[in-house]
Amino acid sequence: YNQDINLFKEKQSYQKGIYLVADFINHNYNREIKIEEMAQLAGLSKNYFGSAFKKALGETPHSYLIKIRISKAKVLLETTDYSLSDIAQKIGFKKASSFTSQFKASTGIIPSKYREKSKKQY
C-alpha cells in the first residue's frame, strides 16, 4: 500500500514538472528552448524527460513547442501585416523558410495563403 502511495506521489511530482515546462513553453516560445533546459526545469534527467512529457501531454516537447508557435503565427497572420520573416522571428524561428515549411506541415497551407484566406473571411 505504501509503495502504491509513493508511486502515485512520484507520478504527481513529475507531472507537475511537465506542466511547469508546458507553461514555460507557452511563455517562451519565441526563443530557442533546449531540451536540457526543459528537463532541468521539470526536475528530470534529459533522457527521461522526453518520454515523461509525451506520457503526460500526448506529444513530444518539440511538437508541443511547434504547435504553440504555429498557433501564435496564425494570430499574427490574421491580425497584423507583419512580413513572414518578421512573424517567423517573433515566434522563435531563425529562418522564414523553416517557419513556412513547419506552418505548411502543421496546417496543410503556406502562411501567405492562410493570411489571404483569413482576410477574406472578414
Predicted regions and their residues:
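A general structural signal marking secondary-structure boundaries and capping sites
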Residues: Y1-D4, N28-Y29, T80, S118
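Short, basic, alpha-helical segments at the C-terminal edge of helix-turn-helix-like DNA-binding modules
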Residues: K11, L65-K74, K113-Y122
